[in-house]
Amino acid sequence: NADTPLPPASMSKLMTLYMAFEAVADGRLRIDETLPVSAAAAAYGGSSMFLDTTDRVTVEDLLRGVIILSGNDASAVLAEALSLDGTEAGFARMMTARARQLGMVNSTFKNSNGWPDPEHLMSMRDLGILADRLLTDFPTYYPLFSERSFAFDGRVPANSQNRNPILGLGIGADGFKTGYTDQAGYGIVGSAKQGDRRIIFVLSGMDSSQQRAEEAEKIINWAFRQFAQKQVVDAGTIVATADVWMGDLPSVGLTVENDLSLLVPLIGTANGVTAEVVYTGPIAAPVTKGQQLGEMVITLNGLPESRLPLVADRDVAKGGFNMRLRTAALVLWEKFAPLTPLPSLPSLPDAPSDAPS
């Protein structure tokens, strides 16, 4: 079940990375800024950068330490720097709140790195949402996930290799993150690109690192053989119109701002794509061009639905007094005489929009 909360192990570090990338983007952190290492961060065992309390480490090195070395200590250093109260626990609460804003409704964080805790849980769907947002929101940093090694200042040379087993297999794999604990088993959030097609997948609960590597490779090969990219909607397409209440126009077009393409099965898709426009109307004037007014919900043969924002294709100002009177009359007529043909209303010169009403 993709929505069942499970122990995510180190895959939850992707949330710490997302929030660190946000902090760099909005200026709360600088990529060349150095951060201190607390005793609590240095005390972490497991996968590590082997930091100690005498270190001051750049944000860039810490990001590589989390991505490539899966450093529990590096995650904690970033967490303490970003937390409002300077603690990892405080940062974990921020992670949970931010996850909700991103639509990750089945994730709860108790630390920055996936250290075992019975209440630290993520669903596989939430991990997929997070991976997609990392790729979409921070493409500049995505190449870090495909780096094969990182020897932080030469210490512990044996601990310098990326743990992602699908990198370098020649199948287009270029991210994201592995994870392992006794409770979680072996897992991976992975991504691969071949041509203009990209897939993101999540595996959890594997019995061994070898099984994880084999299953991840199988998924990539299967996905690119069995699925094709299909353009569903072109940017700028008006897919529906919505009635406007008290506007200087009776309706407004609902359009999509970005292309939408889906990976669809090569077999059995002839009539499998359906789309539904969802909005609450009539829309009250004024309406601003680009204002989100609804969603288009796309379903494909029982696969998870995709939702695309629908925005206004133009500005619609408030109508003048006569236009508002005409609109009210039409609504009242439709409410109280729905079966009677509506008579033609005479055209009236519209009053200025600032006329008293």
What are these regions (language model features)?
Residues 104-108, 116-121, 125-357:
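Domain-terminus/edge residues, biased toward the C-terminal soluble/receptor-binding domains
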Residues 1-138:
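Active-site-adjacent loops and short helices of periplasmic peptidoglycan-processing enzymes
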